[in-house]
Amino acid sequence: MTVAIDYFLLVGFCFAVTSGLWIGLKSIKLI
């Protein structure tokens, strides 16, 4: 169970980082 929770948190963290970088690039292109 703990392994599944750690894997879920890792995937969520990576998704948050990639989405943040994508939003940052989009905002830079809009400027």
Swiss-Prot record:
InterPro entries: Cyt_b6/f_cplx_su6
Topology in membrane: Single-pass membrane protein
Source organism superkingdom: Eukaryota
One MF annotation (Gene Ontology) recorded for this entry: electron transporter, transferring electrons within cytochrome b6/f complex of photosystem II activity
GO biological-process terms attached to the record: photosynthesis
Transmembrane stretches, start-end: 3-23
Location of the protein in the cell: Plastid, Chloroplast thylakoid membrane
Keyword terms of this UniProt record: Chloroplast, Electron transport, Membrane, Photosynthesis, Plastid, Thylakoid, Transmembrane, Transmembrane helix, Transport
GO terms for cellular component: chloroplast thylakoid membrane; cytochrome b6f complex
Primary role: Component of the cytochrome b6-f complex, which mediates electron transfer between photosystem II (PSII) and photosystem I (PSI), cyclic electron flow around PSI, and state transitions. PetL is important for photoautotrophic growth as well as for electron transfer efficiency and stability of the cytochrome b6-f complex.
Oligomeric and partner information: The 4 large subunits of the cytochrome b6-f complex are cytochrome b6, subunit IV (17 kDa polypeptide, PetD), cytochrome f and the Rieske protein, while the 4 small subunits are PetG, PetL, PetM and PetN. The complex functions as a dimer.
Family: Belongs to the PetL family.
Name of protein: Cytochrome b6-f complex subunit 6
Species of the source: Phaeodactylum tricornutum (strain CCAP 1055/1)
